[in-house]
């Protein structure tokens, strides 16, 4: 972690030094760079001709009549007629490029809504996330009939749970209670729409199965949450990071 902080400090100092050198470099060119090299030089013989930089009348930078930078008539920077910056008719930038320009296709909101629904199923559940698939636990219900029924029907029960981030709950019980309710509700609704119904025995077994999976999900999310907080605390308390932050404050204040 300390090595990472040193590398960040070195990278920032190198970047800041390069920016400072770029600011000190003189801008290329000088007076009268680009275009005609003799702006005030007219054609011998009076004022019959305007100042020229090469080419015929009306050519500030060469080309045919009306060509500021070369090309055919009406070509500011070369190309065909009506081409501000080259290309075919009606191409390039400027207002002329809008002629005969095809209109942008309108976004089909039905397609957008369908894509959102297909790619973010949990988005409509108010911030719930879908956990990774788990193996359904082997549970004993107290009698042989229920144990056999569970083994024969366990594939019909959820193997993923819905949950919210652990930092939104005060304790594990609240997390598990919410997780069980939303998971069974969503699974029941989804399965019912496919023409399959659950009995009271199914619901009883699902509650036991989902409860164990929600406990496992809570333990996993809690560990990841606290590991992330600890890593952030170690990073920002390391000497290189403190030095980097102090250097940034010095640059801002100075």
UniProtKB/Swiss-Prot annotation:
Alphabetically ordered keywords of this record: Amyloid, Cell membrane, Copper, Disulfide bond, Glycoprotein, Golgi apparatus, GPI-anchor, Lipoprotein, Membrane, Metal-binding, Prion, Repeat, Signal, Zinc
Positions of disulphide bridges: 179-214
Binding annotation for Cu(2+) 2: 69-71
Stretch list, region Disordered: 25-107
Lipidated positions per record (GPI-anchor amidated serine): 231
One annotated GO biological process: protein homooligomerization
Bilayer disposition of the protein: Lipid-anchor; GPI-anchor
Region feature (Interaction with GRB2, ERI3 and SYN1): 23-231
Positions that bind Cu(2+) 1: 61-63
Propeptide stretches in the record: 232-254
Localisation: Cell membrane; Golgi apparatus
Amino acid composition bias (Gly residues), ranges on this chain: 52-95
Cellular-component GO terms for this entry: Golgi apparatus; plasma membrane; side of membrane
Main location, first listed in the record: membrane
Keyword Metal-binding in record: yes
Glycosylation sites: 181, 197
GO molecular function: copper ion binding
Sequence ranges of the Sequence repeats: 51-59, 60-67, 68-75, 76-83, 84-91
Residues at which Cu(2+) 4 binds: 85-87
Assembly: Monomer and homodimer. Has a tendency to aggregate into amyloid fibrils containing a cross-beta spine, formed by a steric zipper of superposed beta-strands. Soluble oligomers may represent an intermediate stage on the path to fibril formation. Copper binding may promote oligomerization. Interacts with GRB2, APP, ERI3/PRNPIP and SYN1. Mislocalized cytosolically exposed PrP interacts with MGRN1; this interaction alters MGRN1 subcellular location and causes lysosomal enlargement. Interacts with KIAA1191.
Family, per entry: Belongs to the prion family.
Disease (UniProt): Found in high quantity in the brain of humans and animals infected with degenerative neurological diseases such as kuru, Creutzfeldt-Jakob disease (CJD), Gerstmann-Straussler syndrome (GSS), scrapie, bovine spongiform encephalopathy (BSE), transmissible mink encephalopathy (TME), etc.
Function: Its primary physiological function is unclear. Has cytoprotective activity against internal or environmental stresses. May play a role in neuronal development and synaptic plasticity. May be required for neuronal myelin sheath maintenance. May play a role in iron uptake and iron homeostasis. Soluble oligomers are toxic to cultured neuroblastoma cells and induce apoptosis (in vitro). Association with GPC1 (via its heparan sulfate chains) targets PRNP to lipid rafts. Also provides Cu(2+) or Zn(2+) for the ascorbate-mediated GPC1 deaminase degradation of its heparan sulfate side chains.
Domain notes: The normal, monomeric form has a mainly alpha-helical structure. The disease-associated, protease-resistant form forms amyloid fibrils containing a cross-beta spine, formed by a steric zipper of superposed beta-strands. Disease mutations may favor intermolecular contacts via short beta strands, and may thereby trigger oligomerization. Contains an N-terminal region composed of octamer repeats. At low copper concentrations, the sidechains of His residues from three or four repeats contribute to the binding of a single copper ion. Alternatively, a copper ion can be bound by interaction with the sidechain and backbone amide nitrogen of a single His residue. The observed copper binding stoichiometry suggests that two repeat regions cooperate to stabilize the binding of a single copper ion. At higher copper concentrations, each octamer can bind one copper ion by interactions with the His sidechain and Gly backbone atoms.
Protein name as catalogued: Major prion protein
Originating species: Sigmodon hispidus
């Amino acid at each position: 972690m300390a090595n990472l902080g040193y590398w960040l400090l070195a990278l920032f100092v190198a970047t800041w030094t390069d920016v400072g050198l770029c600011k000190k470099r003189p801008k290329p060119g000088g007076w009268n760079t680009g275009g005609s090299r003799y702006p005030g030089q007219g054609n011998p013989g009076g004022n019959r001709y305007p100042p020229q930089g090469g080419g015929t009348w009306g050519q500030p930078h060469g080309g045919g009549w009306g060509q500021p930078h070369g090309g055919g008539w009406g070509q500011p920077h070369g190309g065909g007629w009506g081409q501000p910056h080259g290309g075919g008719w009606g191409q390039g930038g400027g207002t002329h490029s809008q002629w005969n320009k095809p209109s942008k296709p309108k976004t089909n909101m039905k397609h957008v809504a369908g894509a959102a629904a297909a790619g973010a199923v949990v988005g409509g559940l108010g911030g719930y996330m879908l956990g990774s698939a788990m193996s359904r636990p082997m549970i004993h219900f107290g009698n042989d009939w229920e144990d056999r029924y569970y083994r024969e029907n366990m594939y019909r029960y959820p193997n993923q749970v819905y949950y919210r981030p652990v930092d939104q709950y005060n304790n594990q019980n609240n997390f598990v209670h919410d997780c069980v309710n939303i998971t069974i509700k969503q699974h029941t609704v989804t399965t019912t729409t496919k023409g399959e119904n659950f009995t009271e025995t199914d619901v009883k077994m699902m509650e036991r199965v989902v409860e164990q999976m929600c406990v496992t999900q809570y333990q996993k999310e809690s560990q990841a949450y606290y590991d992330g907080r600890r890593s952030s605390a170690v990073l920002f308390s390391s000497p290189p990071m403190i030095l980097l932050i102090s250097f940034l404050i010095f640059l801002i204040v100075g």
